Amino acid sequence: MIKTLLAHVKEYKRPSLIAPLCAALEVFFDMSIPFVIAQLIDQGIQAGNMAVAMKFGLLMLFLAICGLTTGFLAGKFAAEASAGFAANLREGMYDNIQTFAFSNIDKYSTAGLVTRMTTDVTNVQNAYQMIIRVAVRAPLTVIFSMFMCFVVDRRLSIMFLIAVVILATSLYFIMRRAMTSFNYVFRKYDELNASVQENISGIRVVKAFVREDYENKKFTKAAENIYQLFVKAEKIVIFNNPIMMFIIFACMICLSWFGAHFIVAGSLTTGELTSLFSYIFAMMMSLMMLSMIMVMISMSTASAERISEVLTEKADIVNPENPLMEVPDGSICFDHVHFSYKHGSGEEVLSDIDLSIASGEIIGVIGGTGSGKTSFANLISRLYDVDAGSVTVGGHDVRQYDLEVLRDQVAVVLQKNILFSGTILDNLRWGNEDATEEECIEACRQACADEFIERFPDKYNTWIEQGGSNVSGGQKQRLCIARALLKKPKVLILDDSTSAVDTATDANIRRSFVETIPGTTKIIIAQRISSIQHADKILVLDGGKISGFASHDELLKTNAIYREINDVQQQDDGDFDMEGGA
């Protein structure tokens, strides 16, 4: 895990090394000052020698300036290194997520990924900054202070050493318990983020069903849960300060008592006693800082593990060696295909799918909920890989193609239509970033989207809000179809992508496809038989298996499931979503 994270320090190695070096120099300068003060008191002030007092005073000023300068540089470089490290982690996670296959994405919740790229990275950033600066400064201060205490007076230093051991042991047990609590706290952040994301993305539904109070209570409960867990963890950590202060004051009292006796006995000077007070205070403060560092590290350990999971996740689907860079045509063949979302689980979504589709054919796909319609389409563009058998496009196994080439030539309009914030043209050019405005207009004409776009005041420069919230469902579907058409694909898959348009527009879109892209293989997944009855062939899926694969007329004669759907839709003049397999 640590190796994975440190690999993203990259160009920030230099400030990451300079920061602890400056921190070490800062400790040297700061810890030299009490020793100089002791000499100033003993050899200058008490001896009445102003020349010596001036000399040590100037030396103390020089050391203070050097300590201030190196401390400033340590802070500057630590901030630069940690901020750059965090930026690289976010970029690394984002880049790796872009390579994920659908099967990889299925392992994580959206809220979980958002938490990793925000809260978790911030935790690691803060911990890294503490480690390369404070985690160097604090232990060096303890070591240097203890060394100087032994130089000044070994007898009193034994007392300090015992105090340090007692304090360190106490802090160890406190931090050990606190770490467990903090680790659990940050796992709960996913639930909070999921609640926020779900509520904001579905705010219109929340308001439509007047569920504001329910959602507020749900969020309050999640926030209160995290608050209580934090309080529980902090109740453990708060013992830090009283234990720390007790030991410091105990050391001060003992130092004052024994120091006074040693001064009277002539074995210790006033200046040396003053320096011992400074060193013991610096030592104890550094130990307290170390305890805070341990808290920060414990809080960030869980975050680091979660970040590492995303960074080390390998894409299940990658390009083959020497991939094919051209799809010859739109012919498709499923050769006894078996598929499940969890390989080896035995829960097959598709079972023994065996069929051939000629280039340029129009294929309808119909079936009940969970019958495998979308899974069937996803295999063609290799969004998932088959468990057994093979899927070929253009006469070649889809696993032999370059992924970008294959997905450019097999355009899919997914069941969930997503538009991004930007103009209509910006959204259309997701299909082809080099498309001219004329090509975009032509694609919209083919998708019957031009008729409503022309009614907008800004036409193709109309701004689309995030998620397409300012256009209707049918308008969104037609824009997504136009976006796919700009790819000029060999295969076009519409996954229930005209469900929100009226039947007349649906018919116009199908007619436009026949006239403008006759050579493109078109696979239309639908619930309405009217959307696919004119297809060359219709695939009927039931429980992940082929129930029928023929023309509309033939299926009416030979397939009971298809005939039942048709009869119900003819009778009710509506859609019928029969219950299918898992």
Where are these regions (language model features)?
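An intracellular "coupling" helix at the cytosolic face of ABC transporter transmembrane type-1 domains
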Residues: 10-13, 99-103, 119-132, 136, ...
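Transmembrane helix-loop-helix hairpins at lipid-water interfaces of multipass membrane proteins
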Residues: 16-73, 77, 150-155, 266-270
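Hydrophobic alpha-helical transmembrane segments of ABC transporter permease domains
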Residues: 21, 29-33, 58, 70, ...
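ABC-type nucleotide-binding domain
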Residues: 326-582
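Short intracellular "coupling" helices and adjacent cytoplasmic loop segments at the cytosolic face
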Residues: 47-48, 83, 91-115, 119-121, ...
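A short amphipathic helical element positioned immediately N-terminal to and/or at the very start
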Residues: 1-11, 113
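Helix-loop-helix
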Residues: 48-54, 58, 148-162, 232-305, ...
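Alpha-helical transmembrane segments of multi-pass membrane proteins
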Residues: 14-16, 22, 63-82, 129, ...
